[in-house]
């Protein structure tokens, strides 16, 4: 029982995902694996993930075996597993808006003819397509989403292009009878999840959150790409929503700054996050909190993607269509409906057991409940 997976964008995140599947291929059901909810996730284990095709536009990756491409060109994440030859050639995908100006300074675009993505997905009998395209790839990501619908495979949208959380696109997936888990992958323990937890802690302990910022620096191609500020709009919206949605009162946008800040080449795939929260406590006395988080960026989300892929396959098996609500809320920054993280995890556990499904009726109920609780809700 395998999950046939395709990858769009063979960068650092794809490298960590492929390495992770190799690294944990011999685990047992009772093993506690860092970064995964369960080794056995609804009947699917890590070793059940099988990479069958991949797409990229980098001349140094196209035509290579996936095992080689994950270490090629500008990829600079940490190596933690030796990946054998997979017999999976990286194919030339369509570019669209996938290459920003800084990307074009660093890589050579392949001169090979782009393939018909939907046809490849059909030919390879792909179950789940994972999109790892660069931030700002609006047209390119939506083209891959359309290809997934055309081919009848599930889609995991790891970047901040609003598809699962966009009403029009969510309906397209429902009409096509195809599930989507999205949008914008969370890390295992990253800047967004820690910021969310502490913002919620302030409110739970009666501290009014007045102002906050989150500044991120890193040395991978993602951070270089985001130097082009025109590609950042959806990223900033996604990260900001993820934090402010757990705060019950409206925050003045002037008092919230969350987003990537700069590129520091020598950090490689490490990310440093600097976060500050300013609040008001008893007696209108100020209370301030600052912290710094250091992570290897790509491995920090790879386990989450493994769980998201398995959730997408379960949804496919159950013939669900449109946004898969519980997994999207737990694994993604910008889902159709936000839940507090503990509640989202509980819903995923119920989803695994088949007690919660991604139905339109459930979506309506979740939205109504969230609005009644005063949450910032956006609905697909």
Language model features by range: what are they?
Residues 129-131, 155-158, 181-184, 212:
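Short catalytic-loop micro-motif centered on adjacent basic/acidic residues
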Residues 1-144, 150, 229-237, 273:
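N-terminal glycine-/serine-/threonine-rich beta1-alpha1-beta2 phosphate-ribose binding loop
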Residues 134-150, 158-179:
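Rossmann-fold NAD(P)-binding glycine/threonine-rich loop
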Residues 38, 273-380:
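C-terminal active-site/capping subdomain that shapes the small-molecule cofactor and substrate pocket
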Residues 18-20, 64-67, 167-170, 194-195, ...:
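Short acidic, glycine/serine/threonine-rich loops at helix termini
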Residues 8, 47, 61, 72, ...:
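Active-site-lining helix/loop region of Rossmann-like oxidoreductase modules
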Residues 9-15, 133-139, 159-165, 186-192, ...:
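Gly/Ser/Thr-rich loops at beta-strand to alpha-helix junctions
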Residues 172-185, 206, 210:
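Rossmann-fold dehydrogenase core element
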């Amino acid at each position: 029982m395998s999950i046939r997976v395709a990858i769009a964008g063979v960068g650092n995140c794809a490298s960590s995902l492929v390495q992770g599947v190799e690294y944990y291929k011999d685990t047992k059901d009772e093993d506690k694996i860092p970064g995964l909810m369960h080794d056995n996730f609804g009947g699917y284990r890590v070793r059940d993930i099988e990479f069958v095709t991949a797409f990229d536009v980098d001349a140094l990756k196209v035509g290579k075996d996936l095992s080689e491409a994950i270490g090629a060109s500008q990829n600079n994440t940490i190596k933690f597993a030796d990946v054998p030859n997979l017999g999976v050639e990286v194919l030339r995908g369509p570019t669209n808006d996938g290459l920003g100006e800084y990307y074009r300074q660093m890589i050579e675009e392949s001169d090979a003819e782009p393939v018909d993505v939907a046809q490849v997905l059909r030919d390879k009998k792909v179950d789940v397509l994972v999109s790892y395209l660069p931030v700002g790839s609006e047209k390119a990501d939506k083209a891959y989403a359309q290809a997934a619908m055309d081919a009848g495979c599930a889609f995991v949208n790891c970047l901040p292009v609003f598809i699962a959380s966009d009403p029009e696109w969510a309906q397209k997936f429902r009409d096509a009878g195809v599930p989507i888990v999205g949008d914008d992958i969370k890390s295992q323990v990253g800047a967004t999840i820690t910021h969310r937890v502490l913002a919620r802690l302030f409110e739970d302990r009666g501290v009014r959150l007045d102002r906050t910022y989150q500044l991120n620096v890193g040395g991978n191609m993602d951070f270089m790409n985001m130097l082009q500020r025109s590609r950042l709009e959806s990223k900033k919206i996604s990260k900001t929503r993820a934090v402010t949605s757990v705060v019950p009162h409206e925050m003045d946008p002037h008092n919230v700054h969350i987003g990537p800040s700069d590129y520091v080449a020598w950090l490689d795939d490490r990310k440093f996050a600097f976060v500050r929260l300013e609040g008001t406590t008893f007696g209108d006395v100020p209370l301030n909190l600052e912290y710094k988080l250091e992570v290897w960026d790509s491995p920090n989300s790879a386990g989450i993607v493994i769980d998201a892929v398995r959730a997408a396959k379960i949804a496919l098996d159950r013939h669900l269509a449109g946004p898969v609500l519980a997994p999207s809320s737990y694994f993604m920054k910008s889902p159709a409906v936000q839940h507090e993280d503990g509640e989202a995890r509980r819903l995923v556990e119920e989803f695994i057991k088949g007690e919660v499904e991604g139905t339109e009726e459930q979506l309506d109920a979740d939205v109504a409940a969230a609005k009644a609780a005063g949450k910032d809700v956006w609905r697909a």
